[in-house]
């Protein structure tokens, strides 16, 4: 049985990308080509490419599925009425005036109290606890105040304060539905010029929404993976996407998820017969090796943190040994890691590229 330690790997800190490249599609692409379904080093071939070469690995019958969530400026600093400093990270917008948020303070805020945010620009009212989150009531529409006064919530491994460059580059060019507190980073490699090339090649694309939560950075704290409690995120699948997946299957094409968030939404909405069901809801799907994929055939993704649930997910798709070899190669070849880093193209173990 696999344990948490099986998903650890040494990563030199200088390989953690601290800023985005000037050109979105100028990143590198590690293609993990599968030659046989066995989970062995001999069953895969690792190919170093540029991300702009990705069209060479796509077919006209394929469908790329993107997550169109938009990152909100979810981080606030402020103080309690007593003067004690606080930090607020919005996790989810519940309705027009209400959010769920993490609140860091020396003492737990009291229900009914006020938290003064953004240099006293406004105050929110503390409501009931929901698991580890606080309900906060905003005096005006929450998304308006978040956009006006909040700060971009860069991942914890990016060490600089967010600036105007990050506000553009930590956002996909197709982001349109605000609600995420972390970017669907595989999509950061796509720009309008690359989309034009995809269109010219007849590669179809479709969109879903999954609002990425801060739980995506939550560490796994137990060696026994079955004891890990996965975070929950809201997603929506349109009837148009469900139709596109069905048409792709009928034509013999592949469903290629752009990012692990797209994959998690697709697999969460999969029926037992392998069809995709339109609708919306929350998902806490935890994909580990042994999972039987129903929708996704291939995945474009960045490199993930050691011991993370996302490293387990890509291992489930491509094979544990294949991912170990790929990550070892990526470190040796000095690939850039994590949100602003380079990308991989992975194919399901039971599929051929």
UniProtKB/Swiss-Prot annotation:
InterPro entries the UniProt entry points to: QueA (IPR003699), QueA_dom1 (IPR042118), QueA_dom2 (IPR042119), QueA_sf (IPR036100)
Reaction equations catalysed: 7-aminomethyl-7-carbaguanosine(34) in tRNA + S-adenosyl-L-methionine = epoxyqueuosine(34) in tRNA + adenine + L-methionine + 2 H(+)
Pathway listed: tRNA modification; tRNA-queuosine biosynthesis
One Pfam family per UniProt: Queuosine_synth
Subcellular location: Cytoplasm
Keyword Chaperone in annotation: no
EC number(s) from the headed UniProt entry: 2.4.99.17
Self-association and partners: Monomer.
Protein name: S-adenosylmethionine:tRNA ribosyltransferase-isomerase
Lineage: Bacteria, Pseudomonadati, Pseudomonadota, Betaproteobacteria, Burkholderiales
Gene: queA
